[in-house]
Swiss-Prot record:
PANTHER family: LARGE RIBOSOMAL SUBUNIT PROTEIN BL17M, RIBOSOMAL PROTEIN L17. This is Large ribosomal subunit protein bL17. One of its GO terms (biological process) is translation. It comes from Saccharophagus degradans (strain 2-40 / ATCC 43961 / DSM 17024). Part of the 50S ribosomal subunit. Contacts protein L32.
Length: 132
């Protein structure tokens, strides 16, 4: 019987699931926008949001906890140096999940996961042509 077991199984064993979400959180912190299936996106919130909350108070102990969960020094650095200060005044809800249709191959529901309040991409300025 499956009583009080929280979380989605996603047809994977526990080590595969753990590695998959570790990679997804790393990609999310690095790129601030990823595309994945809707069930994975909803489950990703359970892994990413506590890490961002942890990064709001910068300490050696918190950095070690984040490194134990992510295993990537550059990602932990960005988490504590950029994302923690960015979300200092926000009490939660750091991710936005936007549905984006269905995948072509198997019609799986897809979604974008992005960090709220991420800076807009900088557009290249037009180059003036020099007419002599």
């Amino acid at each position: 019987m499956r009583h009080r077991h929280s979380g989605r199984q996603l047809n994977r064993n526990s080590s595969h699931r753990k590695a998959m979400f570790k990679n997804m959180v790393t990609s999310l912190v690095e790129h601030e926008l990823i595309k994945t299936t809707l069930p994975k996106a909803k489950e990703l919130r359970r892994y990413a949001e506590p890490l961002i909350t942890l990064s709001k108070s910068d300490s050696v102990a918190n950095r070690r906890l984040a490194f134990a969960r992510l295993g990537n020094k550059a990602t932990v650095g960005k988490l504590f140096n950029e994302l923690g200060p960015r979300y200092e005044g926000r009490p939660g809800g750091y991710l936005r999940i936007m549905k984006c249709g269905f995948r072509a191959g198997d019609k799986a529901p897809m979604a974008y996961v992005e960090l709220v309040d991420r800076p807009a991409p900088v557009a290249a300025e037009p180059v003036e042509s020099s007419e002599d």
